[in-house]
Amino acid sequence: MAEDSESAASQQSLELDDQDTCGIDGDNEEETEHAKGSPGGDLGAKKKKKKQKRKKEKPNSGGTKSDSASDSQEIKIQPPSKNSTIPVQKLQDIQRAMELLSACQGPARNIDEAAKHRYQFWDTQPVPKLNEVITSHGAIEADKENVRQEPYSLPQGFMWDTLDLGNAEVLRELYTLLNENYVEDDDNMFRFDYSPEFLLWALRPPGWLLQWHCGVRVSSNKKLVGFISAIPANIRIYDSVKKMVEINFLCVHKKLRSKRVAPVLIREITRRVNLEGIFQAVYTAGVVLPKPVATCRYWHRSLNPRKLVEVKFSHLSRNMTLQRTMKLYRLPDATKTSGLRPMEPRDIKAVQELTNTYLKQFHLAPVMDEEEVAHWFLPQEHIIDTFVVENSSGKLTDFLSFYTLPSTVMHHPAHKSLKAAYSFYNIHTETPLLDLMSDALIIAKLKGFDVFNALDLMENKTFLEKLKFGIGDGNLQYYLYNWRCPGTESEKVGLVLQ
């Protein structure tokens, strides 16, 4: 969410390069990752060290071919000749662009890197500085009385389009954009594959607004090349409950990542949210920006070790054969918790009460009404699974949930997709959490998942190692826009974004 009154210079301070991921960043969008961090992982005993050196990408590499109209949008900056009659304003624009390109930095992956990083965009925003010591709670800026009415200007050759996801053709366009251009792991081996049905679930919860599905098209051929979304949520931050938005699915076509389309997307979604009287947001990123309220880590539990090794998602540990690895990760054929069954509509009220009561112990968590509980938890095939525990007297005491998010396996001759389950909300009052999550793994395995992923938030640290999860190789930072509060530990985070 960006400031209306940004100067021309700060409006251009967000730069994209041609790396293969994108998400919410301001000054380096290339590898920001949303709620799941990277789709890749490494489950070997010795964690593979990521190469620190950035790979240089060949021109026009990666992804699918764009059509000629899209390709023609490439920026080519050449110094003007002495006899040039280029207007002064144009020369200034070229000079500014060259300065920005020369100042381009790679994304900060940790606090040490972030301390040396220049955040030209975020320094203009109502977010805490990285070195700021915070002891207070509250909004950084007061709510605006006058919000800009006109959309922000896009670079020449592009146009705004509010996406009607109820239109199957438009939904398919968004699916294609994300499938071909969204978050990849550092080695460009896996890319999230959000299904059209999953996108409807994630982007149309209760209270969703059409204008918060914000797209960018090429003016000439109407090709969809950019997107950002907001959905409403009531979020409790320590003792304050605020109506805010969750920002997600910021994506720009690979071939357009030098056009400053993403910064305008961020500013435009801010404007559209502000018009509805909302001035706070929550978002996640795999890079360090000013200033994380919490940092979490992904863990991975192998369900199909053979496939994970074959696609290089994980690696055999030292002195481990594939057969021994498969035996290590073998699971029972049936769950053991008595009264465990799929959630039904009649369970909504009980699940709501369990959820809101349980989440009160955390510093950052949603507050859900019945309609939201129905939307987020009622089972939908290939999207969301929720299993409740009903005791002998008919009372619901616990539930587990996970959502489905496959990843496309790139450059593999046999395997094209990796089926991943992501831990969602797991609430327990009587069943030990370890038993509940053991059953979650068994259910996921029986449903054909290859891997089960979980963040180390809430009480998850109590079962991760015991259930043979392996630590992932990247962090996921949580951020608040226009809200200042002390940072918190991962185990005090009670919010999961898709």
From Swiss-Prot:
Q: Where is this region: Disordered?
A: 1-87
- Entry's Gene Ontology cellular component terms: cytosol; membrane
Show the ranges annotated as biased composition (Polar residues): 61-72
Q: Which Pfam families match?
A: NMT (PF01233), NMT_C (PF02799)
- Catalytic activities: N-terminal glycyl-[protein] + tetradecanoyl-CoA = N-tetradecanoylglycyl-[protein] + CoA + H(+); N-terminal glycyl-L-lysyl-[protein] + tetradecanoyl-CoA = N-terminal glycyl-(N(6)-tetradecanoyl)-L-lysyl-[protein] + CoA + H(+)
Membrane topology annotation: Peripheral membrane protein
InterPro entries linked to this entry? Acyl_CoA_acyltransferase, NMT, NMT_C, NMT_CS, NMT_N
Which keywords label this protein?
Acyltransferase, Cytoplasm, Membrane, Phosphoprotein, Transferase
- UniProt-annotated binding residues for tetradecanoyl-CoA: H117, W122, L250, V252, S258, R260, V261, A262
Subcellular localization is given as:
Cytoplasm; Membrane
Compositionally biased region (Basic residues): 46-57
Class of the enzyme per the UniProt entry, highest EC level: transferase
Chain intervals with Acidic residues compositional bias:
15-32
Q: Does the keyword DNA-binding apply?
A: no
GO molecular function terms here?
glycylpeptide N-tetradecanoyltransferase activity; peptidyl-lysine N6-myristoyltransferase activity
- Which Enzyme Commission number(s) are listed? 2.3.1.97
Q: Which residues carry this modification: Phosphoserine?
A: S38
Listed GO biological process terms? N-terminal peptidyl-glycine N-myristoylation; protein localization to membrane
**Keyword set includes Cytoplasm:** yes
This molecule's function is given as: Adds a myristoyl group to the N-terminal glycine residue of certain cellular and viral proteins. Also able to mediate N-terminal lysine myristoylation of proteins: catalyzes myristoylation of ARF6 on both 'Gly-2' and 'Lys-3'. Lysine myristoylation is required to maintain ARF6 on membranes during the GTPase cycle.
Describe the family membership recorded for this protein in Swiss-Prot or TrEMBL.
Answer: Belongs to the NMT family.
- The name this protein goes by in its record: Glycylpeptide N-tetradecanoyltransferase 2
UniProt organism field? Bos taurus (Bovine)
